Amino acid sequence: YKRQLPVSFPRSVGNLPAYYNRHPSAFGLRYINADNEPLYPFGFGLSYTTFEYGKPKLSTKEMTVDGSVLLSVKVKNTGSVEGKEVVQLYVRDDLSTVTRPIKELKGFKKIFLKPGEEQIVRFTVDRTTLKYFNRKMQEVVEPGTFTLMVGPNSTDLQDIKFIVK
């Protein structure tokens, strides 16, 4: 069975702080002569089996502010023993009036698969998934492009974009 990390472990002390809920920047957080990825990212875990993720798909590429979109991804146990996997969903608002994090964990699903078995994991993305507090401390969902990211941990992700009108 797979156990997963609730935190990220940096490669070295020079890579601190290692977090993802930060403001985006044109410069990013880059270190010269160093690998920028954490040694063990949030959600990383070891298992006696392996899993393969298909490409994420959306029920529609556009939604209204009060609508919803269904994201689905196929996960397959490619190993020789049964195992558990935690599929994580992250969201990024690509352009907003308030600075938003690069990625936010907005959902996860635990699944159990036998060897060779595959399952389609679905997430409903709606107003509650996309809302945030604006400068007037009002909950809002702004129209624009959003990126949904899905995968087993915070760095091994596949993304897909959609538009909120």
Residue ranges and their predicted role:
Residues 68-70, 118-122, 157-159:
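Intrinsic-disorder/low-complexity, polar/charged segments enriched in Ser/Thr/Lys/Arg/Asp/Glu/Gln
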Residues 2-84, 90, 148-151, 165:
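Secreted, periplasmic, or luminal enzymes acting at the cell surface/secretory milieu
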Residues 97-133:
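Intrinsically disordered, low-complexity Pro/Gly/Ser/Thr-rich segments with frequent PxxP/GP/PP motifs
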Residues 80-97, 103-105:
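Short acidic, flexible loop segments centered on an aromatic residue
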Residues 126-165:
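Terminal connector regions
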Residues 59, 107-109, 137:
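Short, conserved secondary-structure segments in the cores of folded domains
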Residues 65, 115, 142-143:
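Surface-exposed loops/turns
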